Structures are given as structure tokens and as C-alpha cells.
């Protein structure tokens, strides 16, 4: 039975493939091993469910983060494009931006004459904000956006893989449980049959 869980089949992130039980009698040779076997299957099932919950939380976080990165990138590109146009008027840019889900506000941005002086402040997380030249900020945002989209793709693939394995393990647990119920019924009938024998 231990060889059943030592499968070398794994997905790209190392999550092991769930075994499928076709014949319970091949797995459980001795009925006294049922509890151990059933507990191992239940344990693996709970591990898959935990991994799935973790991946779903990651997906939720990424689905919130990606639009924020896209909006920030769009604003930075807009600032750079405005400074590239070389607008001769020294009028500041008037921007409308989102503070939170339901609140928007306006900002007035003065564009420096030298584009090299154009800098933006980016929140990096954990209450840290750094000032970057506009070109570096755009490159950083593009990289973070690409990484986040890649992580979303990977996490979505993992959730689908885990969903399939959870279903397989639930079927395995049901087969084991039904096998044990049938074994107990057969044992009970055999005992009742021996009681009725008259010698």
C-alpha cells in the first residue's frame, strides 16, 4: 500500500498525482489494515483540499493585484507619452485616478522640462514607497504584471489539477468505505449462519 502513494507522477510544481483504486482487494490484503489504509487516503485528501484552498486564495489575491498593476502602468505610460510629446505649454496635466473602489479624485501633475527629471512614486507593499524614474517604473511594472499573470496561469492550472485529484481521492475513499461495509455485512451473515447450525 505504501507504494501506492510513492507515485513518481507529479505536475510541474511537484504535486503528486492521486492513485486510483480499481480493486480494493488488491490494496487491502488483510482486513485489519483497513483503518490504516483508509486514514492514509483521508490524510492525502485533506492535503489536496488544503493545497486547493491555498491556491484559490492566491488566485483571488492575483485577480485583485493585476488590475491595480495595469492601471498604474497605464498612468505611468500616459505621463511618459505626455512628456515625450514635448508640449510647449508649461501647463500641468490634470489626472483623474482611483483612491479606492468607490472614490476617485483629481491630481495636478507638473511635467519637468527635462524628461530625466520625471519620477513617480510606486507602492511596493508593506508600507514602502520608492521613487523611480518614469522609464524604470514602467519596466518594473511590466515585469511585475507579467510575473503576476504567469502566477495566475500556474495557480489556475494547479487548482484544476488538485480538483481532479480531490475527486479521485473522494472516489477512492468511498470505494474503501463501501468495501468495509460489505465485508462487515458478509461477516455478520456468516456469523448468523453458524448460529443456526445444529450439531
Curated annotation (Swiss-Prot):
One of its GO terms (biological process) is microtubule-based process. Pfam families: Prefoldin. InterPro entries: PFD3 (IPR016655), Prefoldin (IPR009053), Prefoldin_subunit_alpha (IPR004127). One of its GO terms (cellular component) is cytoplasm. Transmembrane segments: none annotated. The keyword Acetylation applies. The keyword Acetylation applies. GO terms for molecular function: tubulin binding. The modification N-acetylmethionine is found at residue 1. Keywords: Acetylation, Chaperone. Heterohexamer of two PFD-alpha type and four PFD-beta type subunits. Binds specifically to cytosolic chaperonin (c-CPN) and transfers target proteins to it. Binds to nascent polypeptide chain and promotes folding in an environment in which there are many competing pathways for nonnative proteins. Belongs to the prefoldin subunit alpha family. Present with 6550 molecules/cell in log phase SD medium. This is Prefoldin subunit 3. It comes from Saccharomyces cerevisiae (strain ATCC 204508 / S288c). The gene is PAC10.
Amino acid at each position: 500500500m505504501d507504494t501506492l502513494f510513492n507515485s513518481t507522477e507529479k505536475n510541474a510544481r511537484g504535486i503528486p498525482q492521486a492513485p486510483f483504486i480499481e480493486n480494493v482487494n488488491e490494496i487491502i490484503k488483510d482486513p485489519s489494515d483497513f483503518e490504516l489504509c483508509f486514514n492514509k487516503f483521508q490524510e492525502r485528501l485533506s492535503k489536496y483540499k488544503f493545497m486547493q484552498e491555498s491556491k484559490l486564495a492566491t488566485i483571488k489575491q492575483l485577480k485583485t493585484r493585476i488590475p491595480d498593476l495595469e492601471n498604474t502602468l497605464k498612468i505611468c505610460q500616459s505621463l511618459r507619452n505626455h512628456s515625450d510629446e514635448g508640449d510647449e505649454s508649461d501647463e500641468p496635466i490634470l489626472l483623474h485616478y482611483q483612491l479606492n473602489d468607490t472614490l476617485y479624485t483629481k491630481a495636478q501633475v507638473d511635467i519637468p522640462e527635462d524628461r530625466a527629471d520625471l519620477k513617480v512614486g510606486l507602492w511596493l507593499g508593506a508600507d514602502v514607497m520608492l521613487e523611480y524614474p518614469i522609464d524604470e517604473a514602467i519596466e518594473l511594472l511590466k515585469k511585475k504584471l507579467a510575473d503576476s499573470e504567469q502566477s495566475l496561469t500556474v495557480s489556475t492550472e494547479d487548482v484544476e489539477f488538485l480538483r481532479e485529484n480531490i475527486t479521485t481521492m473522494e472516489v477512492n475513499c468511498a470505494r474503501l468505505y463501501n468495501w468495509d461495509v460489505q465485508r462487515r455485512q458478509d461477516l455478520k451473515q456468516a456469523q448468523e449462519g453458524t448460529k443456526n447450525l445444529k450439531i
